[in-house]
Swiss-Prot record:
Name this polypeptide is given: Toxin VmKTx1
Keyword flag Secreted: yes
Name of a matching Pfam family: Toxin_2
Tissue: Expressed by the venom gland.
Transmembrane stretches, start-end: none
Swiss-Prot/TrEMBL domain comment: Has the CSalpha/beta fold, which comprises one or two short alpha helices connected to anti-parallel beta-sheets stabilized by three or four disulfide bonds.
Propeptide: 22-28
Signal peptide: 1-21
Major localization listed first in the record, in broad terms: secreted
GO annotation, cellular component aspect: extracellular region
Site description Basic residue of the functional dyad, residues in chain: 53
Disulphides: 34-54, 40-59, 44-61, 49-64
Further remarks about this protein from its record: Negative results: has very weak or no effect on many potassium channels (hKCa1.1/KCNMA1, hKCa3.1/KCNN4/IK/SK4, hKv1.1/KCNA1, hKv1.4/KCNA4, hKv1.5/KCNA5, rKv2.1/KCNB1, and hKv11.1/KCNH2/ERG1), and on the tested sodium channel (hNav1.5/SCN5A).
Amino acid sequence: MKTSCLLTILLLSFLVAVAVAEGERSARAAAISCVGSPECPPKCRAQGCKNGKCMNRKCKCYYCG
């Protein structure tokens, strides 16, 4: 019983850490302003992402990692 409880706590801690890291990565990418979608892919690639498009005058970067 104690082992399964410990494993559950470790799993939840890992998931929280991953969620926080993804949120920070998204916040960095969201700071890129744009006017049209053609200007986003190069800016997103410079951030380490594979693609991006302009949404609400901010670049939305995809496949970051």
